[in-house]
Regions:
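Terminal, compositionally biased segments
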Residues: 14-25, 32, 36, 62-65, ...
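Long, charged/polar-rich coiled-coil alpha-helical scaffolds that serve as structural arms
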Residues: 55, 59-62, 66-69, 73-76, ...
Length: 241
């Protein structure tokens, strides 16, 4: 019976050693103690099979069970951290796309509008590069077997990228606002012009002059949105008189 148990324990130690290698972590002290215990137990059985101390065997089994629990917990932590790192890559890619969109919108807004307030500049490129390099370092440490420090570092990284993402979305929305407003004004002017035609007022000199002015402002860069809004409003008021 002892030799059967020896074989079971031996296979358990092999499995645990393989798990340590897969996790790329230092050998736990409990596994070292279990290996030493196993070697001593083998020697004792070889010398005096009938004199094997059952307590000694139970101690070995307890060490193996404790080590297995410790490594399985660590394995779960690794899997969870691996998932978090995958999500972090997705968050970084999302921020990078937001920045590309923000830069394009910022450039277009700068070129096409005369602003009373300057548009919001995108995130500096060096900040985005720093976030990318930071994540690469965390991944490298994780792959070398570091768990707890990587988890803490990733939490800090995630907090920062979430703040950057919120800022990037706000910048994109702010820079898109004049573009969206221009499009909305163009649509309103077209609808009002159609309404004027339907009501037989398209030839009204004041309406005709207002629509010409509004179209010129809305389709000529740089666009003065305040003036365009005023012209469309005046056109609507005149039409509804």
């Amino acid at each position: 019976m002892d030799r059967i148990r020896i074989k079971i324990n031996h296979q358990s130690l092999i499995d645990l050693q393989q798990l340590v290698q897969q996790l790329q972590v230092p050998i736990p002290p409990t596994l070292i103690a279990a290996k030493t215990n196993f070697t001593n137990l083998q020697i004792q059985i070889d010398r005096d099979p009938l004199g094997v101390n059952q307590t000694f065997n139970r101690d070995l089994t307890s060490l193996i069970d404790h080590t297995r629990h410790e490594l399985e917990t660590l394995s779960q932590q690794c899997q969870h951290l691996q998932t978090r790192l995958m999500i972090a890559r997705q968050q970084l890619a999302q921020l990078q796309q937001l920045e590309r969109d923000s830069i394009a919108t910022y450039t277009e807004s700068q070129a096409k509008f005369s602003h009373s307030l300057p548009p919001i500049a995108p995130l500096p490129a060096e900040e985005l590069t720093a976030m990318e390099q930071w994540l690469e370092r965390l991944v490298a440490k994780f792959e070398s077997g570091t768990i707890a420090p990587v988890s803490m570092g990733l939490t800090n990284w995630t907090n920062k990228i979430q703040a950057y993402t919120t800022a990037a979305r706000s910048a994109l929305a702010a820079n898109r606002l004049p573009l969206d407003t221009r499009q909305e004004l163009r649509g309103r002017l077209d609808a009002l012009s159609a309404k004027a035609l339907a009501k037989g007022k398209a030839e009204d000199p004041i309406l005709a002059d207002l629509v010409i002015q509004a179209r010129q402002v809305l389709y000529t860069s740089p666009i003065a949105l305040d003036l365009a809004m005023d012209l469309v409003k005046r056109y609507e008021q005149r039409l509804n008189q």
